[in-house]
Amino acid sequence: MEKYIMSLDQGTTSSRCIIFNKKGEIVSVAQKEFTQIYPKAGWVEHDPLEIWGKQAGVAGEALNIARISPEQIAGIGITNQRETTVVWNKRTGMPVYNAIVWQCRRTAGYCDELREKGIDKTIKEKTGLMLDAYFSATKIKWILDNVEGARELAEKGDLLFGNIDTWLIWNMTKGKIHVTDYTNASRTMLFNIHELKWDEELLEILDIPKSMLPEVKPSSCVYGETDEILFGVSIPISGDAGDQQAALFGQTCFNAGMAKNTYGTGCFLLMNTGEKAVDSKNGLLTTIAVGIDGKVEYALEGSIFIGGAVIQWLRDELRMVKTAQETEKYATEVEDNNGVYLVPAFVGIGAPYWDSYARGTILGLTRGAKKEHIIRAALESMAYQTHDVLKAMEEDSGIELKALKVDGGACQNNFLMQFQSDILGVEVDRPEVVETTALGAAYLAGLAVGYWKDRNEISQNWAISRSFAPAMEDEKREKLIKGWHKAVTKAMDWEDKE
């Protein structure tokens, strides 16, 4: 009986299940979108019960599409939108509030208060993260302080916290297992990445009871088995990593200096720094890349909040395109950006600027600016932001990048990939299997159950679909980048500080 690995890929806008074979090839995919909830400006929420329902649904669907039985699944890997925070009652299994999404800015003011007390330095030293509303810690505190009865339940030991991986595993095991992995824990702003444990001092500062937190384990190990009610059989849950770390693993960036960019809702650039946690001087995050083989490896990360989401905005709000794919056609219908820059700082701007008060702007408009120029500027904004992050990584790590591995939905846009290569001045490599986030989770799960022997075996699966080489003159590149930096400066510090 041929065996497969199931990967549950719980993203920001959709829940997916992808089944892989031994060669790392996709056997089947099932996907369902779920509701985005915007209660106030800058607030973003999801319904955890909807996420669980849709995730369980696509798992069954993927098995049906592949025409394989649950007995043929050797292990399940989970990868998830990171930082998004769920708090639930362990007795009833019901969330006390909606999941607060990584994009949500509601705790920006509280982060400013902590910064005034100098706590940002403590957080950076211990967790490798910037003090920001993006991470889980202040979201947990917000729920405890603002949801009626939540603090009392937490003090009694009745509330559990988890990122989406923890929430899924808890539900898959019918409440038996409350666990996360090192990569997800490293995104909470509560985990000491050097000592590899929840940090008592930070828990005290934020007034979060330790009893709420999950046990932290490696990214590749058997956490438990699915309850039989789910598939009719028990299947080992054996891999878990935050989406960006999973993509780094799926891209086989196993050596220090290897980097990838995932062009999803946000863009996320990670560079493997090996067993050394590199402290960033450029506003990048130091994070855990993977916990495997009895050790952890670290990475530098630059987070770009609005990547592919700018294309959704062009489609849904401005109605300039009917589909995301059309952006490539429009962008190539004009010779250049005609001096137009779009800074998509809809929810502030991330690395290396970190300004919660920046807002989106379109600059350089003249009477000759057309829809095509704005669409092109939107695509180019992803490449410029990637450039800024990559330059900061090179500076911090002392490693010059030779090539960039790419994945995520927008990497299928050939215009964007060519422009990315031109702006970076290095080769951009798109792999055969672009679902590297799900693939990384599958690899982690498969390694834990002996489906794959080791990383060397996995590396042999990686193949290039297309390579993009830089074709832009240095002078033109520098001029474009200078214009972009000028535009970013104009977008910063726009929103009034409360």
Swiss-Prot record:
InterPro entries: ATPase_NBD, Carb_kinase_FGGY, Carb_kinase_FGGY_CS, FGGY_C, FGGY_N, Glycerol_kin. Pathway: Polyol metabolism; glycerol degradation via glycerol kinase pathway; sn-glycerol 3-phosphate from glycerol: step 1/1. Belongs to the FGGY kinase family. Keywords: ATP-binding, Glycerol metabolism, Kinase, Nucleotide-binding, Transferase. It comes from Clostridium botulinum (strain 657 / Type Ba4). Pfam families: FGGY_C, FGGY_N. One of its GO terms (molecular function) is glycerol kinase activity. It comes from the Bacteria. This is Glycerol kinase. It catalyses: glycerol + ATP = sn-glycerol 3-phosphate + ADP + H(+). Key enzyme in the regulation of glycerol uptake and metabolism. Catalyzes the phosphorylation of glycerol to yield sn-glycerol 3-phosphate. The lineage of its organism: Bacteria, Bacillati, Bacillota, Clostridia, Eubacteriales. One of its GO terms (biological process) is glycerol catabolic process. Homotetramer and homodimer (in equilibrium). GO terms for cellular component: cytosol. Its EC number is 2.7.1.30. Glycerol binds at R82, E83, Y134, D243, Q244. ADP binds at T12, R16, T265, G308, G409, N413. Sn-glycerol 3-phosphate binds at T12, R82, E83, Y134, D243. The keyword Nucleotide-binding applies. ATP binds at T12, T13, S14, T265, G308, Q312, G409. Activated by phosphorylation and inhibited by fructose 1,6-bisphosphate (FBP).
